[in-house]
Structure formats: structure tokens, C-alpha cells
Amino acid sequence: MANKLFLVSATLALFFLLTNASVYRTVVEVDEDDATNPAGPFRIPKCRKEFQQAQHLRACQQWLHKQAMQPGGGSGPSWTLDGEFDFEDDVENQQQGPQQRPPPPQQCCNELHQEEPLCVCPTLKGASKAVRQQVRQQQGQQMQGQQMQQVISRVYQTATHLPRVCNIRQVSICPFQKTMPGPGFY
């Protein structure tokens, strides 16, 4: 009888710990195609207003554009084989001298910290979409096909991990879903 009571108590305690631990990590998934959704990345009207008040995350847009346009990833963020950022490597390289990889500017992180946690991913998606349009307008004649897709993919991959880099509580990544085959995020 004592063994059963102990087993039930231990199971309940474990269940409580697992439930409590999962409350502190929230991932907001943005999975609608902007082309079929008239609200674009802003399914929540409050997020559209925050995006406009934050001046469309201007500092983040500038940084995303700069990182996406790095030729061959030369001095941009380093990537692991599974497409993840290797941020630890970036931090080490920042301390090694003049050829350092720039972290997101503090102003970009400040913009993200001012967002409601629920709106971080939708506003980042809006900023990424603006950068995508800017790249297409500026580079449309020089870049075609796969090269353009790679640049646009880098925009979204970089934006995906910005919440983690900027230490945004309750949001570690923004899992932007691919809506078309291939490496691009559209």
C-alpha cells in the first residue's frame, strides 16, 4: 500500500514539474500563407498596430537585409549543417579581432523587447517580408532563381532565431513555415 501511494505521489509530482516547466517556454508558430490571408502575417490586429508603432522594426529590417546580402556567408552568421545558427561560434569570433561577425544591433533587440510576446513572431515575419520585397526590388535584375531564393531564405532563417539571440522571454524561435517547395520562404 505504501509503495502504491509513493508511486502515485511521485507520478503526480513528475507530472506537475513537467507541466510547470512547459509553461515558461512559448513558441508562436506562424503558418499561414500571406498570399491567401488578407491580414498578412498579422492574424492578431494588436500585432499589426504594434508593428506600425515600432516603425516596422526598422533596425531589425536593416540588420536582416545586411546579413542576407553577405556574399557566401563570408562575414555573416555561421550555420551548422542542419540550418541552425552557430551563435556560440559567432560570439567566439567577435572576440578574435577586426573580422568579427556583427551581432544584431542593440536597437533591433530593443525593438523586439518592446513587442508583446504573442506579437514577436508576427512582427518579425512582417519585417522579413518587407526585407524580402526590398531585396527583390533592389536585386531583381542582378539575382535570379536559386541565388534569389538563397538570399530570401537567409532573411527568414536569420529572423527565425532573433528572439533567442535577443533573449526574448517566452519566445525562443519563430518557426516560419515554408509554403513553397525549395529553399525559399514565401
From Swiss-Prot:
Cotyledons and the axis. Disulfide bonds: none annotated. InterPro entries: Bifun_inhib/LTP/seed_sf, Bifunc_inhib/LTP/seed_store, Napin/2SS/CON. SMART domains: AAI (SM00499). Pfam families: Tryp_alpha_amyl. Transmembrane segments: none annotated. GO terms for molecular function: nutrient reservoir activity. Residues 22-38, 77-97 form a propeptide. Gene3D superfamilies: Plant lipid-transfer and hydrophobic proteins (1.10.110.10). Keywords: Disulfide bond, Seed storage protein, Signal, Storage protein. Residues 1-21 form the signal peptide. The small, basic, water-soluble napins are one of the two major kinds of storage proteins synthesized in the seed during its maturation. The mature protein consists of a small and a large chain linked by disulfide bonds. Belongs to the 2S seed storage albumins family. This is Napin embryo-specific. It comes from Brassica napus.
